[in-house]
UniProtKB/Swiss-Prot annotation:
Name this polypeptide is given: Mitogen-activated protein kinase kinae kinase MST11
Organism: Pyricularia oryzae (strain 70-15 / ATCC MYA-4617 / FGSC 8958)
Native organism taxonomy: Eukaryota, Fungi, Dikarya, Ascomycota, Pezizomycotina
Enzyme class: transferase
UniProt xrefs under Pfam families: Pkinase (PF00069), Ras_bdg_2 (PF14847), SAM_2 (PF07647)
EC number: 2.7.11.24
Length: 915
């Protein structure tokens, strides 16, 4: 019999009763009251569906893309840098849809992040293409099935066949529904065939079509023959097209996870974000050893096994209520019993984090659903013939038509993509769509923390996605050129100077601008070798130039080292963005572009901003208006800096990475949305309060200069935002470290506490109370330097408050800060002194030693009553050293007058080992 090709076009309307010999014969064979359907000649065959199971795809389908279209797609997913690589390998749309991570790696895409992003984009593209073809399949099938109507008005009961024949392989590895119109004529030699479609989506469509028209897809009669159009009217079998299903293995089966290997001691563990790994536990004899092996597999600290636990999902839905934590006894039973399905989807969680997140639950549910599908398939394949007959009698349906359950992952992913695409297409375009801001890209972390400046400088386009590569490259290039130019100018000025650079810094009057002048730096010892010099002075900010420029070599003969000094940027091995200035005595002092309170030279000496600006005009090079504007203090309008990825956000606003367009210095900009003019809504009142808090923070920070306090650089405003520019601190907060690594070891706590006390001592000397010392507000850079941040609720001590004390109701202290870190006098609102920060410091030490806040068993309201009652103090960790317990006992003194100051605590034995 003639089977039709999958690409044959579907003919126009079928021939009339008078067109075609077969049709005429059929008409003559029946009484006038009945007439057979008009059928084209048997030599013409076609596919009625034109679905994803045939090769007749839409021309716009990704399968038909050429190399130019593929390159355009790469640019749309921010992978345009690999355009040449794809062209070199002649990748077209058909090749693109078949690519996976291994293929991308073999092509030469070295970055893991780019491979993952590109693979996920290709996967979504593949899913979208299949979903579109699936819709065309349904529409086409519904449009064509009406052409195959039954001969009789009353349908006959279908006969069932218990035979099961393996599906025939197809050449193009697709499903294909094909119709053999010659089968409508009587053919006694035609064999009895039946097939069981095992593809979830096609079979679902077929079942829907068969429900709408019971004559489509019925099985042949038990005699193995079909009565043709010439059969008598009382024929039991009606003429209909015969559908033949073919199937081979598909490369897009949607499988999520393979089953664990049999007879091997392994478990599958799901971690944060739905990441799964298979862990070998053959050599583990206790649950603690299992936990340590698991932590090692996920690159976590093994000595923190007590901070982690295992959870398991009981049902098939990602519902936290169906999730339970496993104790050691139950965990051991699960991992040792290879018949337990839970060992294939254990969830690893930190104990303080509580129940698993949504991503972990979804991954566990998907694995459980796939296990259920595989179990169903195995059960169906192992059923005997007698059992099949019983099932057919009970269900009233042919065994071969019983469909396996849909693949949950495949179905959910595809339906979700189809729904999202349809929703995006049907959504009306808003009137102010031109003003909508694109969704901000979150700063890509580095080991769970903020990336160092070297990493940002090596891939600026990733961290500044809203700016063209040309603008970013020009900024980096100009910043290096300007740094070299300033080095030459300051070198000439220092040679002409008759006094030491260090002394001029102290005598320099401040310039009344936001970025007034250079910061007065502590002179370092004599010049050291380059490898040692790079380790000094980590308390300066990062810049693109500091990561790209090598240190300029000192000019002049070694015989006359006092003849010259030079200015250069730190080498790439340091995070310093400061300018290194060597004075005639050989001392090195470093400055940054935005440091205030000092100048390079006094008003009449060399090195002041005025002298530098004058020297730039006389150095014979082209005028640089942007640099002159920067030297005059005009540094913070929107054209002078570039907004990068999102670092963090909170109730106050958002913090973004920023790049100064003149100097190439990396910054952090805190943005608060400005209230609408004349608006009095509750939201605008909240914005005004945040603006006031930000202004209060600016007024305090602009006068602070300390290596353990986040450096304020300047501020600016626009019609929509108020911006405050701070130094960029790579790394993260203490709270982030605790979330990532658990409790900190005591030697590290000692180091952090000493630096925090240095910063608090500096603040308290200037009558400033921070009022919110906690792990989230203490930053740790990638060199281990502490930075105290977030001065939004800090304030200066008023003399009237100190004199009148708690009896001054007009200036009654407000309840400011975080409840778990509050001192008793703050909760009672009796007084607010420097000693409140000391209590909060003790709570911070407990937080670092335990990994949780000081009152983990209390809600905020319960903690307020506990602390305000004056009888409860945070529990001191039992495993703390004697010195640490004594230190905490001093900080938790209930009477704030007896509580030691920051300077007194610096002499504590707890901090002695690191002095």
């Amino acid at each position: 019999m003639a089977m039709l090709a999958s690409k044959s076009p579907f003919p126009a309307p079928l021939a009339t009763s008078g067109s075609g010999m077969m049709a005429g014969t059929a008409q003559a064979s029946y009484p006038p009251s009945r007439r057979a359907p008009a059928v084209p000649p048997a030599s013409q065959s076609f596919s009625p569906t034109e679905s994803e199971f045939s090769d007749s795809d839409d021309h716009d389908s990704p399968k038909h893309w050429d190399e130019d279209k593929v390159c355009e797609y790469l640019r749309s997913v921010r992978c345009g840098e690999y355009e040449k690589l794809f062209r070199k390998n002649h990748i077209n749309g058909e090749n693109l849809l078949e690519m996976d991570k291994d293929v991308l790696k073999e092509m030469g895409i070295e970055k893991v992040g780019d491979r993952v992003r590109l693979f996920l984009s290709i996967k979504k593209l593949r899913t979208k293409a299949i979903a579109g073809q699936k819709k065309r399949n349904r529409d086409s099938f519904a449009g064509h099935e009406s052409m195959y109507t039954p001969v009789s008005e009353s349908p006959s009961k279908p006969f069932h066949s218990s035979s099961r024949v393996m599906p025939n392989p197809s050449v193009n590895k697709r499903y294909s529904r094909q119709i053999d119109l010659s089968g409508m004529a009587y053919d006694p030699s035609r064999p009895t065939t039946s097939s069981r479609p095992t593809s979830p989506l096609p079979s679902a469509d077929f079942r829907t079509a068969r429900t709408r028209n019971p004559y489509v897809g019925q099985q042949p009669t038990p005699t193995g023959s079909l009565r043709g159009l010439g059969s008598p009217p009382d024929s039991q079998a009606n003429s209909r097209p015969v559908l033949t299903h073919t199937r081979t293995d598909s490369g897009m089966d949607g499988s999520l996870m393979a089953a664990l290997p049999q007879n091997q001691d392994v478990i599958r563990v799901i971690s944060t974000g739905g990441v799964t790994k298979v862990v070998k536990i053959a050599d583990c004899n206790t649950c603690e050893e299992v936990m340590r092996v698991t932590l090692r597999k996920f690159a976590l600290r093994e000595d923190h096994e007590r901070n982690y636990c295992f959870w398991v999902l009981s049902g098939l839905d990602p519902d936290p209520k169906q999730c339970r934590r496993l104790g050691d006894t139950e965990l051991w039973r699960v991992i040792k019993d290879q018949k337990r399905p839970e060992r294939n989807r254990l969830i690893l969680r930190r104990v303080p984090a509580g129940e698993p997140g949504q991503s972990e639950l979804e991954r566990a549910a998907a694995i459980a659903m796939e296990e259920a599908q595989q179990s169903h398939s195995r059960a169906m394949d192992n059923v005997g013939a007698r059992s099949q007959i019983k099932v057919q009698k009970v269900l009233g349906e042919n065994w071969d038509n019983l469909q396996p359950p849909l693949s949950p992952v495949l179905y959910q992913d595809r339906e979700r993509n189809v729904y999202n695409a349809a929703r995006d297409l049907e959504r009306p375009e808003p009137l102010d769509s031109g003003r909508l801001q694109p969704r901000r890209k979150v700063l890509r972390s580095f080991g769970g923390l903020r990336p160092p400046s070297e990493l940002i400088a090596s891939d600026l386009t990733t961290y500044f996605p809203d700016h063209p590569r040309e603008d970013i490259d020009r900024t980096a290039r100009l910043s290096m050129r300007r740094s070299a130019r300033l080095s030459k100018v300051n070198s000439r000025l220092s040679v002409a100077s008759s006094f030491s650079m260090a002394s001029s810094i102290q005598d320099a009057p401040p310039i009344p601008t936001i970025a007034d002048s250079w910061l007065q730096s502590t002179p370092l010892p004599k010049a050291r070798p380059r490898d040692l010099q790079s380790r000094l002075q980590h308390g300066y900010r990062d810049s693109v130039a500091s990561s790209m420029l090598d240190t300029l070599q000192e000019e002049g003969s070694p015989i006359e080292p006092n003849r010259k000094s030079y200015v250069s940027f730190a080498d790439s091995g340091s995070d310093s963005a400061a300018v290194s200035v060597t004075d005639p005595d050989g001392n090195i002092v470093r400055h940054s572009y935005f440091d205030e309170g000092s100048t390079i030279g006094s008003g009449s000496g060399s090195g002041s901003f005025g002298d530098v600006s004058k020297a730039l005009n006389e150095d014979g090079e082209d005028a640089d208006e942007d640099l002159q504007s920067f030297l005059s203090g005009e540094s913070w309008d929107d054209s002078k800096w570039m907004k990068g990825a999102l670092i963090g956000q909170g109730s106050f606003g958002c913090v973004y990475l920023a790049l100064h367009a003149i100097t190439g210095e990396l910054l952090a900009v805190k943005q608060v949305e400005a209230p609408s003019p004349g608006a009095n809504s509750q939201n605008d009142a909240r914005k005004k309060s945040m603006i006031e808090a930000l202004k209060r923070e600016i007024s305090l920070l602009r006068d602070l200069r300390h290596p353990n306090i986040v450096q304020y650089l300047g501020c600016g405003s626009s019609a929509e935002y108020l911006n405050i520019f701070l130094e960029y601190v790579p790394g993260g907060s203490v709270q982030t470290m605790l979330n990532s690594y658990g409790a900190l070891p005591e030697p590290l706590v000692r180091s952090f506490v000493r630096q925090i006390l240095n910063g608090l001592s500096y603040l308290h000397e200037r009558e400033i109370i921070h009022r919110d010392i906690k792990g989230a507000n203490i930053l740790v850079d990638n060199k281990g330097t502490i930075k105290i941040s977030d001065f939004g609720i800090s304030k200066k001590i008023e003399a009237t408050n100190l004199l009148n004390g708690a009896n001054n109701n007009k200036h009654r202290p407000s309840l400011q800060g975080s409840v778990f870190w509050m001192a008793p006098e703050v909760v009672k609102q009796t007084s607010y002194t420097r000693k409140a920060d000391i209590w909060s410091l003790g709570c911070l030490v407990v937080e670092m030693m335990t990994g949780t806040h000081p009152f983990p068993d209390c809600t905020q309201l319960q903690a307020i009553f506990k602390i305000g009652g004056g009888k409860a103090t945070p529990t001191i960790p039992e495993d703390a050293s004697t010195e640490a317990k004594a230190f905490l006992a001093q900080t938790f003194e209930m009477d704030h007058n007896k509580r030691p100051s920051a300077d007194d605590l610096m002499l504590s034995p707890f901090l002695t080992p690191i002095t």
